[in-house]
């Protein structure tokens, strides 16, 4: 199938064509000049498309058919936990008492919403083993930055101004060193050993009196549990540093293990991942941060408290790092996460982890004969393959990903983590059936065979999508980085 053009809505515009009508004016007409100063009024008409209602419906329906989401198909994007989002979450989030309130309302009028927020914090405290939680951060990387700022404030409050370095593993999420840099730290990399885990000897080498924190994901980005976590925590704590938990992979340990029991001092969660807030479209997310007792004074203000008179926000926080987001976090996502936690209960959350781990190991073992398996051991919720053997045949991991598009699958994460050559990172989540997993596995096996027998079909993929192989060289050398006004076309 050749590339199919899809006109922009602006390109469909025809002067005089109308797609809506306004009700008859039943109030006195007011001129803009009487309400706004001239510098706030447009000098020229806005360039809005003039299209019919039918054109609008067909245009956006066509675009929606090109989208892929967890409601339309399998989404095995490693390190992203693209699980199904139960629709009961959406129903509850649309309750008028949640959907129609305003953050500037008096606290007495939103006690129900505040109770939900408080209860959610308490649930997250129990799930993570922390002592307190803030719901303010808007997403994962925002939570990382917030947690690091808390650690920075803690060290500075103790007069320890020389702790300027944050240690991250070579398999870490790219947001970890980025967040550390934005928080004012220098990042130091600790190597992985031959088993895909943090090398303890290298950790001992890089930890010193300048260490502010070690950032870890556990299980790590290779899908492997850091079995030496207690010793790692001891190494960092003995040096005066803090241990930070990146909650990206919490789906692998729900009701099985808690970061607080592993020795972590700070944790951020991704409610839009682990706790089924919808994600993948750019937001909104929710990245609550939990801390141990000695970091509570530095939590962003206000904090939500419960007294005999109800719920209220406490702004009297002299050591707080300040606000990290207007108002009180992305409330709608928090409602969805709360609904999910209450729906599942402790036993349900335990089953989430058990099935996520089972699905990942099943897929890994079925695919291992056809792709390189860098670390041949049981994984947790996700696993990493390598396309090294296919690369020797002239087929790159990128080609494999594009070939999957021909079969209607969203490709896994590729080329990450960076310490695995030709990396293919797969996370099936717990919500997928064996039949779905088998269908994807069969296509991956077919692609591996094609790489041997007919590599061109993989190298030139995709063949059935509306947009086929793009000119990567031209895109890199001559990217279009600025908006270009379209030329109207005949529709």
Swiss-Prot record:
GO cellular component, one term: glycine cleavage complex
Domain of life of the organism encoding this protein: Bacteria
Gene3D superfamilies, per the entry: 6.20.440.10, Aspartate Aminotransferase, domain 1 (3.90.1150.10), Type I PLP-dependent aspartate aminotransferase-like (Major domain) (3.40.640.10)
UniProtKB keywords: Oxidoreductase, Pyridoxal phosphate
MF terms (GO), sorted A to Z: glycine binding; glycine dehydrogenase (decarboxylating) activity; pyridoxal phosphate binding
Record has Oxidoreductase as a keyword: yes
NCBIfam families per the UniProt record, alphabetical: PRK04366.1
HAMAP family linked to this entry: GcvPB (MF_00713)
Assembly, per entry: The glycine cleavage system is composed of four proteins: P, T, L and H. In this organism, the P 'protein' is a heterodimer of two subunits.
The protein, known as: Probable glycine dehydrogenase (decarboxylating) subunit 2
Naturally occurring in which organism (per UniProt): Bacillus cytotoxicus (strain DSM 22905 / CIP 110041 / 391-98 / NVH 391-98)
Gene: gcvPB
């Amino acid at each position: 199938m050749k590339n199919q053009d899809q006109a922009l809505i602006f390109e469909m515009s025809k002067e005089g064509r109308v797609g809506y009508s306004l009700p008859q004016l039943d109030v006195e007409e007011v001129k803009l000049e009487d309400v706004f100063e001239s510098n706030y009024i447009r000098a020229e008409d806005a360039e809005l498309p003039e299209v019919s209602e039918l054109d609008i419906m067909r245009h956006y329906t066509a675009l929606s058919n090109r989208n892929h989401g967890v409601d339309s198909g399998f989404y095995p994007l490693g390190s992203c936990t693209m699980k199904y989002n139960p629709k009961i979450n959406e129903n509850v989030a649309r309750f008028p008492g949640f959907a129609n309130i305003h953050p500037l309302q008096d606290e007495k009028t939103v006690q129900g919403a505040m109770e939900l927020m408080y209860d959610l914090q308490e649930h997250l405290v129990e799930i993570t083993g922390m002592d307190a939680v803030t719901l303010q951060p808007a997403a994962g990387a925002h939570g990382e930055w917030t947690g690091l700022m808390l650690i920075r404030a803690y060290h500075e409050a103790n007069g320890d101004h020389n702790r300027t370095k944050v240690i991250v593993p070579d398999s870490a999420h790219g947001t970890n060193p980025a967040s550390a840099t934005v928080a004012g730290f220098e990042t130091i990399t600790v190597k992985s050993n031959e088993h895909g885990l943090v090398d303890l000897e290298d950790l001992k080498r890089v930890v010193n009196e300048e260490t502010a924190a070690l950032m870890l994901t556990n299980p790590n980005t290779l899908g492997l549990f850091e079995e030496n976590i207690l010793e790692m925590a001891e190494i960092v704590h003995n040096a005066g540093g803090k241990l930070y938990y990146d909650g990206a992979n919490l789906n692998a340990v729900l009701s099985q293990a808690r970061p607080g029991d592993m020795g972590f001092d700070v944790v951020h969660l991704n409610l839009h991942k682990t706790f089924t807030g919808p994600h993948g479209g750019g937001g909104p997310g929710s990245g609550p941060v939990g801390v141990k007792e000695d970091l509570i004074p530095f939590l962003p203000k206000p904090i939500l408290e419960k007294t005999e008179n109800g719920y209220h926000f406490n702004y009297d926080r002299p050591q707080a790092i300040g606000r990290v987001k207007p108002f009180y976090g992305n409330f709608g996502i928090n409602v969805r996460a709360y609904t999910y936690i209450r729906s599942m209960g402790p036993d349900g959350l335990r089953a989430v982890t058990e099935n996520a781990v089972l699905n990942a190991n099943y897929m890994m073992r079925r695919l291992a004969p056809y792709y390189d398996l860098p670390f041949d051991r049981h994984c947790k919720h996700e696993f990493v393959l390598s396309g090294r053997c296919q690369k020797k045949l002239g087929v790159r991991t990128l080609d494999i990903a594009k070939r999957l598009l021909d079969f209607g699958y969203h490709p896994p994460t590729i080329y990450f983590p960076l310490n695995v050559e030709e990396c293919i990172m797969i996370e099936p989540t717990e919500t997928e059936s064996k039949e779905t997993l088998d269908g994807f596995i069969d296509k991956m096996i077919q692609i591996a065979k094609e790489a041997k027998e007919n590599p061109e079909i993989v190298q030139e993929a995709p063949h059935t999508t509306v947009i086929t192989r793009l000119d990567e060289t031209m895109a890199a050398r001559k990217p279009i980085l600025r908006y270009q006004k379209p030329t109207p076309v005949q529709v």
